[in-house]
Amino acid sequence: MPALPPGSVLIVVKRGPNAGSRFLLDQPVTSAGRHPGSDIFLDDVTVSRRHAEFRWENDEFHVVDVGSLNSTYVNREPVDSAVLVNGDEVQIGKFRLTFLTKPKNHGGAGGTHDSGPADR
């Protein structure tokens, strides 16, 4: 996989029927579920039609379970909502997704700033 550009946020499907798929999180809210209109379409009976959302709030990305039947997990722990950091594993049904982010560099001595959709 090519290097992630500074300021980018990406979800990579590591396990599940569409392993290897990548989704750029470039909106304030990105939906994930079995509904064909989902931003991240996960087509399996273990996934609710409207399962979870990835939200950019208060300069952080959150994953929020939106009433799924089988729960949403972060690093193998069930969550209603959780702040995501680089490398976290999000499980939605049988799908395992990796959250990847690369902070924007603003020059200076190692100064970084987490970027999200509002910064673009």
What spans do the regions from the language model cover?
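Short, charged beta-turn/beta-strand-edge "cap" motif at the junction between a beta-strand
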Residues: 96-98, 103
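Short Asp/Glu-rich motifs
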Residues: 91, 102, 109
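Intrinsically disordered, low-complexity acidic Ser/Thr-rich regulatory segments
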Residues: 1-42, 105-120
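Forkhead-associated
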Residues: 21-94
